[in-house]
Amino acid sequence: MKPVIALVGRPNVGKSTLFNRLTKSRDAIVADFAGLTRDRHYGNGRQGKHEYIVIDTGGFEPDASSGIYREMARQTQQAVAEADVVVFVVDVRGGLSAQDHDIANYLRRLGKPCVLAGNKAEGMQDSMHLAEFYELGLGEVHPVSAAHGQGVRSLVDLALKPLALPEIEEEDAAAEKNVIRLAVAGRPNVGKSTLINTWLGEERLVAFDMPGTTRDAISVPFERNGQKFELIDTAGLRRKGKVFEAIEKFSVVKTLQAIESANVVLLLLDATQGVTDQDAHIAGYILESGRAVVIAVNKWDAVDDYGRQQLERSIETCLSFLKFAPLHFISAKKRQGIGPLWSSIIQAYKSANRKMPTPVLTRLLQEAVQFQSPKRSGMFRPKMRYAHQGGMNPPVIVIHGNSLEHVTDAYKRFLEARFRKEFDLVGTPLRIEMKTSSNPYTDKQNS
């Protein structure tokens, strides 16, 4: 499970600059849910083998009437609660302020791992300006320059150190045991809890909460027709006696983590509300993560024929990038249409892990080129030689040849369609990578 780092601090200390540095670019922002997570942004970061989620909490300016805690509760408190470690950003050039003291007092009371980052410290590593921040009682001040990238790598190492992260291979333990890890993702009140409880009731399971750290999602193991599953909860599933009580509490971090750790994601939509921006955000993250996906539209019984037609068009338009995903229309409350979901989930899992032999891929590639060759780009005509599989979950096909950087997106989609049809790839993204062979005569010509 990816650890979560929250960036906390008063306005204009450089949190957003540090956020963009950690996530490499502004394009790395994966979720910005208006209204729900106002003034908080979520992004992906990576250091070495370890990936992590970063939360930029935005600044806050407490006034005399509201006080620090009310303002913290509105924006920052939720992010801090979701985080495994807090990076408290201060402005070395601006100096220590009363707000810094207020924030430090709050963080100390939480008892959560905290790293103090002295930003804007270009050329001030040994300056007396750093000394005053020791008054905050949060230990050593680590000088960084978010704008120039100085000290950022060591800051991340320090933040991740107390979390005792497992080796990457341990994350794949469930896959080795042929267990399908299934995450049910969706906005609040789309019916995730109802669907989960219906499943558990149908299977008459003795389910249990698996113990884990604060960053672990709750998992419910169960078996259906001989296939083992592990349901990753994003709805706040809790046990009450022998009955599970699901609490719909939307957490962006929990949703992102569940998607990352799943083999298959069931994206649940609400037929009565259509496809919203939040739905599209979640769908986009599923695609970005490379997870297999099945789409289910819940509360299908609550809309008339005209509403159904409008919804189908909305899905085709707003979620066109998931057109490879099986689409189901269900009513979790009335238990209608739920059975066929399992077939699609298993099919998506098998597609994501399908092995594709090199001879077959190369034959399909050659047949595709004979049927329709890639267009010339100026004086360059891409020449494709052979293909092989470069990975699974999601499946990756690597194509080798010359001048492949000139292959158009339209031609890649043409190839994707042919590969999908041959290998019956349903419910999984398919990534096609082009590798241009180096010219062995380049060095001789330049010598």
UniProtKB/Swiss-Prot annotation:
Keywords linked to the UniProt accession: GTP-binding, Nucleotide-binding, Repeat, Ribosome biogenesis
GO molecular function ontology, one term from the record: ribosome binding
Database matches in InterPro entries: G_ENGA (IPR031166), GTP-bd (IPR006073), GTPase_Der (IPR016484), KH_dom-like (IPR032859), KH_dom-like_a/b (IPR015946), P-loop_NTPase (IPR027417), Small_GTP-bd (IPR005225)
Residues annotated to bind GTP 2: 186-193, 233-237, 298-301
Ranges of residues in domain KH-like: 354-438
Residues that, per the record, bind GTP 1: 9-16, 56-60, 119-122
Sequence ranges assigned to domain EngA-type G in this UniProt record: 3-167, 180-353
Gene3D superfamilies: 3.30.300.20, P-loop containing nucleotide triphosphate hydrolases
Pfam families hit by this protein: KH_dom-like (PF14714), MMR_HSR1 (PF01926)
GO biological process, one term: ribosome biogenesis
Superkingdom, taxonomy of origin: Bacteria
Stored SUPFAM superfamilies: P-loop containing nucleoside triphosphate hydrolases
PANTHER family: GTPASE DER
HAMAP family cross-referenced by the UniProt entry: GTPase_Der (MF_00195)
Entry function: GTPase that plays an essential role in the late steps of ribosome biogenesis.
Stated family: Belongs to the TRAFAC class TrmE-Era-EngA-EngB-Septin-like GTPase superfamily. EngA (Der) GTPase family.
Quaternary structure, from the entry: Associates with the 50S ribosomal subunit.
Protein name per UniProt: GTPase Der
Organism: Acidovorax sp. (strain JS42)
Source species taxonomy: Bacteria, Pseudomonadati, Pseudomonadota, Betaproteobacteria, Burkholderiales
